[in-house]
Design a protein with these regions (language model features):
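Glycan-recognition and catalytic cores of secretory/periplasmic carbohydrate-active enzymes
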Residues: 1-253
Length: 253
């Protein structure tokens, strides 16, 4: 700290201002039920696109919430947690992280490999660089927060052979693994090697498709086609920052 006195003088008021913003976001918060790739009628409380007149009453179903908004909020909540130690920021960040990762397309292709990628939102079929890249760094940060804490585990759902199963693993391992998987998807699907920048998205319109299994409804994979769109700078930036954080955590070049 080059100016410790300046920091000590102003940090409390900025921390208080951030907390006010955090509480105010509840006007964008709502609750709905979602049929995802591995969950039937799961209840989630993300932040919506539009502001409500009362806290917790925002409409958030379908296209009224998008995953990338949640990702950027997770990033700021984790930064605030590391600076303040406020547990509520970490808890909310993990709630939103679970919601975002529920959007990961874990359905399998003909070779038994995950399709991968996160759609723009639960009401969309397209997958975007902006709904994948921003989540890499915060997942690495979460992994570091729980590194060495063996008692902290998480249960998640997967499709190892086309059937839905649950598995319990350490949070540090799970978050780091998902960071690497999302990073690989982002790089493989959006990076233009000849230009060194990223496409915007892949896929387009169309309704979200569902299928039934054991009397329950789940989301189905949607074919995407070729990537395209304008190469917005922040989509390349999240790939770079994600790579830097992954390298710092793993040492893998």
């Amino acid at each position: 700290q080059l100016e410790p006195q300046l920091y000590e003088t102003h940090f409390p008021r900025y921390a208080a201002r951030f907390h006010s913003l955090f509480m105010g976001m509840d006007y964008y918060k709502g609750t709905f039920r979602l049929n995802s790739y591995t969950r039937h009628q799961a209840e989630w409380s993300p932040y919506g696109v539009n502001r409500a007149h009362a806290k917790g009453q925002a409409q958030v179903d379908g296209v009224l919430n998008v995953y990338d908004d949640q990702m950027w909020i997770v990033r700021e909540l984790l930064r605030a947690y590391r600076l303040t130690g406020e547990q509520a920021y970490l808890e909310r960040a993990e709630e939103l992280t679970a919601y975002v990762l529920d959007g990961w397309d874990c359905t399998l292709d003909a070779q038994g490999q995950e399709h991968g990628g996160i759609t723009w939102g639960p009401g969309y079929t397209s997958k975007h660089a902006c709904s994948n890249g921003p989540m890499v760094s915060p997942l690495v940060w979460l992994s570091q927060i729980y590194k060495g804490k063996r008692s902290r585990t998480i249960q998640y759902t997967l499709l190892p052979d086309g059937t839905i199963r649950t598995q319990r693993v350490r949070k540090s391992s799970y978050y780091l693994d998902m960071a690497a998987r999302i990073y690989r998807y982002h790089k493989q699907h959006y990076l233009m090697p000849d230009k060194g920048v990223c496409h915007d998205m892949e896929g387009g319109g169309g309704e979200v498709a569902y299928h039934s299994a054991d009397g329950k409804t789940y989301r189905s994979h949607a074919p995407l086609g070729h990537p395209g769109g304008k190469p917005y700078t922040y989509n390349t930036g999240t790939l770079i920052s994600g790579a830097a954080d992954l390298y710092a955590a793993t040492g893998q070049e």
